[in-house]
Swiss-Prot record:
One of its GO terms (molecular function) is peroxidase activity. The chain crosses the membrane at residues 18-40. Its EC number is 1.11.1.9. This is Probable glutathione peroxidase 8-A. The gene is gpx8-a. Keywords: Membrane, Oxidoreductase, Peroxidase, Transmembrane, Transmembrane helix. It comes from Xenopus laevis. PANTHER family: GLUTATHIONE PEROXIDASE, GLUTATHIONE PEROXIDASE 8-RELATED.
Amino acid sequence: MEPLNPYPVKFSSPKAKVSVVFLSMLLCTGILCVLQLGFLRAKGGDFYSYEVTDAKGRAVALSKYRGKASLVVNVASGCPHAEANYRSLQELHREFGPSHFTVLAFPCNQFGESEPGTNQEIGALAKRNYGVTFPMFSKIKILGSEAEPAYRFLVDSTKKEPRWNFWKYLVDPQGQVVKYWRPDETAESIRPEVASLVRQIIMKKKEEL
């Protein structure tokens, strides 16, 4: 069988040729957009779709926290806000966790260079001084081109970039950010939002029984 059209297509005018080229470009652009959108949804559709590194250098899939409410915080041991924030975070973790809520702490040295220690030193200090029992991950960057992808998702979702240590993002069970707080906002202002989200989780689980 011979090809249906063995000869080059002849255009009746230059305008027709330009139109075909333009339409082809639009089609290719559309296909690329669809593929990119699918990739973004697969790789970064929610906070729990990312992987991070724990304090011992091991990969941790954040999907293990899916179904819980998470308060994600950039911590720093040498920050003036450290004591008040660590103690209030531990209190929230003790009160509402661990079945339905957790605090996820990410040390960062980008604000005032107030977290210069190693992962082991950071974790030991938090446990010794403040009785921290919530997860502490490897030290990361949250600003600039080297920002941790999971943190970049939080920033992109809220359009609010942390300006200092102990910036807090509340993530719902589906991995979407529902609220954020600055470091000077007290645990009392956070507790009602966490309590409300935890109640919703408990009610949903009861309905599914």
